Swiss-Prot record:
Species whose genome carries this gene: Enterobacter sp. (strain 638)
Annotated YcgL domain residues: 1-85
One matching Pfam family: YcgL
Protein name: YcgL domain-containing protein Ent638_2370
Alphabetical list of PROSITE patterns matching this protein: YCGL
Length: 91
């Protein structure tokens, strides 16, 4: 199984995985509006892989099979001040 990964033109660190290059027919229109013009990031073989860097491999495969796409959102921002205060015991 291969997938094609696109980077969002509107949202930093947001990626859309689809089954075929330039085929967004199964992606909801509202999602595409918010995503912006997709920018090709890479073609990626999923078979034989044990993991992906920033996404759960099984969730990606299931989403591609069931709904035709997988949306990878950026991780939540770190609250360094909160971490520092908790480390200092001042929370």
């Amino acid at each position: 199984m291969f997938c094609v990964i696109y980077r969002s033109a509107k949202r930093d660190q947001t990626y859309l995985y689809v089954e075929k290059r330039d085929d967004f027919s199964r992606v909801p229109e509202e999602l595409m509006k918010g995503f912006g013009t997709p920018q090709l990031a890479m073609l990626l073989p999923l078979d034989g892989r044990k993991q992906l860097v920033n996404a759960d491999l099984e969730k990606v495969k299931t989403a591609l099979k069931d709904q035709g796409y997988y949306l990878q959102l950026p991780p939540p921002p770190e609250n360094l001040l909160k971490q520092h205060l908790e480390g200092e015991g001042k929370n």
